[in-house]
Structure formats: C-alpha cells, structure tokens
C-alpha cells in the first residue's frame, strides 16, 4: 500500500542515526577541502595572467583569466574568451567550466572535490599550459 503522509519507519531510523551520529566527520571534511583549496590557490597564485578568488566554503574555486585573453596558443589559435581558456586547459588535461556559463566572464571554475594529489597535479598542468601561451609578437 502507499502512504501520502508521514515518514516511513526506515526513513525515521535513518534520520535518527544521522542526528545522533554527531558531526565529527565534518571537521575532517572541512580540513581536507581547506587543504585542497590552499594547494590550488598557491599554485595558481604563481601563474601570470590568473587571479584566484579564494573560496570561504564549498568545493569550487573561481579563477579570473582576463590576463590570458588576447594571447596565442602554440598552434597559433588566439585565446579570446574564458571558454577558450577552458578549452586549452582541457587539452592540457584539466577540466573546468567557463564562467560565461554562469554570466561570470572572464572567469572559470575548477572543482577541488577530488584527491589532494589530483588538485596538485592540476595546478602544475594549468601553470604549464598558461606558460605556453604567448603574445604573438616575435622578437
């Protein structure tokens, strides 16, 4: 039979267990995300052309990439937008989302909801990819 009101006994038991279980796990999660955030912010803070908005919570880091716009990839393609930056990063092994998808151009979003070593490697790959962009001028 179906019920249209009241919580099931299984649901009630699960809710009670969640409330009685305490929040000890939360401190561990906060510390882990803070470490990942700090690793990525430190790495990207060294990259010319990027500015990082340090998040106070959550698991996304927003990065301003206006300093990369107008530069050229090694294949000669011009980087005109945050979407172009994200496409270049994807080719370099890092997935992100263009800020223009949220009305936040010229920013892009990165997730830190992964292992710290993965975040560290992403920072290295982003630095390497950005270092490959050039002004297009020959000297």
Please tell me what each predicted stretch does.
Residues 1-139:
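PLP-dependent class I/II
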